[in-house]
Curated annotation (Swiss-Prot):
The organism's place on the tree of life at top rank: Bacteria
The protein's assembly and partners: Part of the 30S ribosomal subunit. Forms a tight heterodimer with protein bS6.
Pfam families named among the record's database cross-references: Ribosomal_S18
GO molecular function: small ribosomal subunit rRNA binding; structural constituent of ribosome
Keywords: Ribonucleoprotein, Ribosomal protein, RNA-binding, rRNA-binding
The keyword GTP-binding appears for this protein: no
Family: Belongs to the bacterial ribosomal protein bS18 family.
Protein name (record): Small ribosomal subunit protein bS18
BP GO terms, sorted: translation
Annotated organism of origin: Halorhodospira halophila (strain DSM 244 / SL1)
CC per GO annotation: cytosolic small ribosomal subunit
Name of the coding gene: rpsR
Disulfide links within the chain: none
Main function: Binds as a heterodimer with protein bS6 to the central domain of the 16S rRNA, where it helps stabilize the platform of the 30S subunit.
Length: 74
């Protein structure tokens, strides 16, 4: 009775047919990091393992090139 329908998670990259996640696409990458700068795990975002690895690599590259912050502004 008290249950509610939970929407199924799906990989947006697989649905869109993305070949490679670009480290310069900051608008996409910002959706996958928290306010404190941590990478959001795939069990929360629904990203497949292949794209989660690409995502982590792209975020780390963007951080190294100072396109994304390592931590929040404190």
């Amino acid at each position: 009775m008290g249950r509610f329908f939970r929407r199924r998670k799906y990989c947006k990259f697989t649905a869109e047919g993305v070949k490679e996640i670009d480290y310069k696409d900051l608008n996409t990458l910002k959706n996958y990091i928290t306010d404190t700068g941590k990478i959001v795990p795939s069990r929360i975002t629904g990203t497949s393992a292949r794209y989660q690895r690409q995502l982590a690599r792209a975020i780390k590259r963007a951080r190294y090139l100072a396109l994304l912050p390592y931590t929040d502004r404190h």
